[in-house]
């Protein structure tokens, strides 16, 4: 029996990035494709509560020119994973693959990331996870019209590392392998093991004076101090060295110092 891979994302079940990821690994495993019905970027590992949350709709995703069955879940990426594991899957997935995300997931933004939120939810069910994200301009990161991207470098990374994890498992104390692929990467771009930066690649800008009784969405802008990102970090790797960043992430958030 082939292994079962749960594919998900935070950009929505019809995202070309999700289809590209499925195409990259479809020969290695049976695929269960379950993702939010709509764009859910920056939802983290949240579980919103509303009357429509948890509704599930089957749909077709075009993968390599062929239709594959997928499921859209009304809710966050983490909710999609939970419903996939608890209701849709007929057996426990061997691996969760989250992406390919429009926009890098690095530094302090990791806790905001729906891509990583889905991966952490999978690991909470005992499923190892890989997250794959492509560096794109900020204005594309929340887009629901899915601008065209070159996914090939991301697909190569996914295919190689999925095979490796299925064969060998994750390294000790690792919950997720977090891959970030820089703009312009190709088959010659090396992979570098990095650590999570203490900076962010973007920040919220201060709003102009406005009536507080009206709804408002904070806007992001590039971090003007990005060049202060630490050497050896995920941000430094993709923004300045232009290499593929691989950050092994753990589940335990406890600090090493200051604990009894």
Q: PLM features: what roles do these ranges have?
A:
Residues 104-113:
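Glycine/threonine-rich flexible loop motifs
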Residues 84-90, 117-128:
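Alpha-helix C-terminal capping segments
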Residues 149, 166-168, 172-260:
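C-terminal accessory domains and tails appended to enzymatic cores
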Residues 32-34, 71, 97, 128-132, ...:
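Hydrophobic/aromatic beta-strand patches that form the interior of the parallel beta-sheet core
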Residues 11-19, 211:
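Short acidic, Gly/Ser-rich segments with clustered Asp/Glu that frequently serve as metal-coordination loops
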Residues 113-119, 142-165:
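Active-site glycine-rich loop that binds ribose-phosphate moieties when present
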Residues 2-5, 19-87, 91-92:
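A cross-family phosphate/adenosyl-ligand binding-site feature
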Residues 123-146:
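Glycine-rich phosphate/pyrophosphate-binding loops
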